[in-house]
């Protein structure tokens, strides 16, 4: 897949998976995200780009309430998953995170076997009635993480013994094991070498057949390669959102053009 593949592809009209309406995020008195409105489409890769500190990772963490773990963080506005408010008091954040999975910047396999890393979520959420069903989920997830062939003969070896790229693909397999609807990725390739990065990017393109994928990246080349939609954040504002090809070749806002051409960053 080259830089222009995702940019040049025609995006079919997709239904909205996540809708954010008037979202603001505060860390104490600091206003980190300012009145963001955006719709994330189903079975589409959406990239969040922008300079360091622009708010893209903060907003990403709003989408599965990871910011709940920060005492001084306050979120206002509405974020709807399939039309349901994820910040409703009746929503269980643990269950939400099974629906909206997360892959972090640094690979973080649990100090468990490869098998138990992937089986952890299905066990917690009661997704398997017996060992045979759990085995099936683990294999299916490792295949979706594009790592099954590399680990199928050592499933009981520690996940931490894998290479960095393998660990990140294991974390992706772990995230999809609970059958999420959305997969969030916060700089998933920043700690990986170019070969491992290419493998993860190829995997992201495959994952969108089954999931909505939202990726935060500092690499504009990566955003161009893997995404169909791109959102540009600057100083806590969502400056521009649209088809990736348009954002990179014909942006409407001068701030977007300045970032794309390297004049701000």
Swiss-Prot record:
InterPro entries recorded: AAA+_ATPase (IPR003593), ABC_transporter-like_ATP-bd (IPR003439), ABC_transporter-like_CS (IPR017871), P-loop_NTPase (IPR027417), PstB-like (IPR005670)
Record-annotated ABC transporter domain positions: 18-260
One BP term from GO: phosphate ion transmembrane transport
CDD domains: ABC_PstB_phosphate_transporter
One CC-aspect GO term: plasma membrane
Subcellular locations according to the entry: Cell inner membrane
Record-linked PANTHER family: ABC TRANSPORTER I FAMILY MEMBER 17 (PTHR43423:SF1)
Family named by the database record: Belongs to the ABC transporter superfamily. Phosphate importer (TC 3.A.1.7) family.
Protein name: Phosphate import ATP-binding protein PstB
Organism: Ruegeria sp. (strain TM1040) (Silicibacter sp.)
Organism taxonomic ancestry: Bacteria, Pseudomonadati, Pseudomonadota, Alphaproteobacteria, Rhodobacterales
């Amino acid at each position: 897949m080259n830089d222009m593949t995702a940019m040049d592809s025609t995006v079919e009209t997709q239904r909205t998976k996540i809708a954010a309406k008037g979202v603001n995020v505060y860390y104490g008195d600091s206003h980190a995200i300012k009145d963001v409105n955006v719709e994330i489409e189903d079975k589409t890769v959406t990239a969040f780009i922008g300079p360091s500190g622009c708010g893209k990772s903060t907003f990403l963490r709003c989408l599965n309430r990871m910011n709940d773990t920060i005492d001084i963080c306050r979120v206002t506005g509405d974020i709807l998953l399939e039309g349901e408010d994820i910040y409703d008091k009746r929503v269980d954040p643990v269950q939400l995170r099974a629906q909206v999975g997360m892959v972090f910047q640094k690979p973080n396999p649990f100090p468990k076997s490869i098998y138990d890393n992937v089986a952890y979520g299905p066990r917690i959420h009661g997704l398997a009635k017996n060992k045979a069903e759990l085995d099936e989920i683990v294999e299916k997830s490792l295949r979706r993480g594009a790592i099954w062939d590399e680990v199928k003969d050592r499933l009981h070896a520690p996940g931490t013994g894998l290479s960095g790229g393998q660990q990140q693909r294991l974390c992706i397999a772990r995230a999809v094991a609970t059958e999420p609807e959305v997969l969030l990725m916060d700089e998933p390739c920043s700690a990986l070498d170019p070969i491992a990065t290419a493998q993860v990017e190829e995997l992201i393109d495959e994952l969108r057949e089954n999931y909505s994928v939202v990726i935060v990246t500092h690499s504009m080349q990566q955003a161009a390669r893997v995404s169909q939609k791109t959102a540009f954040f600057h100083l806590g504002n969502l400056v521009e959102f649209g088809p990736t090809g348009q954002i990179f070749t014909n942006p409407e806002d001068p701030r977007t053009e300045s970032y794309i051409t390297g004049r701000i960053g």
